[in-house]
């Protein structure tokens, strides 16, 4: 994937199939390509970013927190070493900056104190510029990336980094919530429902078999990914149960709230989720998936819906279906 060094504030808008890159600093006349310096598979200039991931679930009304996990991320914007001191001084003092400014229709302001380093080679230090790449922006909204990248670059000017000084990325790196949410999604696991039913033994033809998801499986799931002060949390709430049967039956296919647990004394009409088998069978399997409402929240105030899983996990049970037998012995009553 080709990247070009652009004037500060300029935008290279590629097609939807290619990355969009923003780079701070003036264009170099020698055709310098930052790809040669910034290795994305083994980037020595960007610290390895460790994102903390925590998972919470609700069980029987109580919140259960899992052990924290870690993930790794590449920031969408970072600093990279670009110009040597004499190069940058020649660029501005030799007139090339003015010619490029005319070509791009922009004003190029030199970094503060650039003449102080006009004789400083790599043994003294190097100028570092800001770079952003949509390769590390997992959201398909390219306009959101451009807005974020423009703000980041405008607030991170080209700086001189002396030899032996800390990597400027140590303080500059930020992972925005828009990136963290995808890490949280990767860690989100939505369980299959654990099903209970009544009768607990064999079912009976033409009588409803109650079905419901247990409290332990019909439970909210949360995953939060955090780096520094930024975080994104994905919240998945079960809102229903979908049933199917591998044979002839009347089925409440969409059961709100996971079904109604059976209690002695409840009428047959009290159930919100049942299967009525129409024929006897040695074995019938009832399968179910949970219906999830999923959204995410971020440290920046974001609260947006997310798509539920396309192929949710399936829970099931197998039951024998019997006919009701009525026996009349013909003995007259006395």
Task: Briefly describe each language-model feature range.
Residues 30-169:
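Solvent-exposed N-terminal domain segments of exported/luminal and surface proteins
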Residues 202, 244-250, 278-285:
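A short, structured loop/turn motif at beta-sheet edges
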Residues 238-266:
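Short acidic/polar micro-motifs centered on Gly/Asp/Asn
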Residues 218, 235-239:
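Short proline/glycine-enriched turn/loop motifs at strand-loop junctions of beta-rich domains
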Residues 301-328:
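Short beta-strand elements
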Residues 260-287, 292, 297:
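Solvent-exposed segments in extracellular or luminal domains encompassing
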Residues 133-230:
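Extracellular-facing segments of soluble proteins and assemblies that are Gly/Ser/Thr-biased and enriched
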Residues 1-29:
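Secretory targeting and sorting signals
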């Amino acid at each position: 994937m080709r990247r070009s060094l652009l004037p500060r504030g300029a935008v290279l808008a590629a097609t939807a199939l290619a990355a969009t890159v923003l780079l701070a600093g003036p264009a170099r006349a020698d055709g310098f390509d930052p790809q040669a310096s910034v290795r994305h598979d083994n980037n020595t200039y960007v610290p390895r970013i460790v994102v903390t991931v925590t998972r919470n679930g609700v069980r029987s009304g109580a919140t259960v927190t899992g052990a924290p996990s870690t993930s790794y991320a590449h920031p969408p914007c970072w600093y990279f070493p670009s110009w040597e001191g004499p190069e940058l001084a020649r660029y501005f003092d030799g007139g090339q900056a003015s010619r490029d400014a005319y070509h791009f229709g922009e004003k190029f302001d030199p970094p503060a104190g650039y003449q102080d380093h006009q004789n400083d080679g790599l043994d003294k230090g190097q100028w570092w510029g800001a770079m952003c790449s949509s390769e590390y922006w997992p959201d398909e909204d390219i306009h959101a990336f451009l807005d974020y990248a423009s703000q980041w670059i405008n607030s991170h000017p080209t700086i001189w980094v002396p030899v032996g000084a800390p990597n400027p990325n140590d303080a500059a790196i930020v992972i925005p919530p828009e990136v963290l949410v995808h890490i949280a999604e990767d860690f989100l696991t939505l369980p299959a429902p654990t099903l209970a039913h009544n009768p607990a033994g064999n079912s009976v033809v033409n009588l409803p078999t109650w079905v419901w998801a247990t409290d332990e499986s019909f439970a909210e799931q949360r995953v939060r990914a955090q780096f520094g002060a930024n975080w994104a949390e994905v919240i998945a709430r079960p809102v229903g149960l979908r049933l199917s049967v591998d044979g002839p039956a009347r089925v409440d296919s969409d059961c709100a709230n996971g079904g109604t647990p059976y209690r002695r004394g409840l009428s047959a009409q009290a159930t919100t989720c049942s299967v009525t088998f129409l024929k006897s069978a040695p074995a019938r399997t009832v399968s179910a998936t949970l219906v999830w409402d999923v959204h995410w929240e971020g440290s920046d105030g974001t609260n947006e819906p997310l798509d539920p899983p396309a192929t949710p996990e399936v829970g099931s049970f197998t039951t024998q279906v019997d006919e009701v037998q009525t026996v009349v012995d013909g003995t007259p009553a006395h």
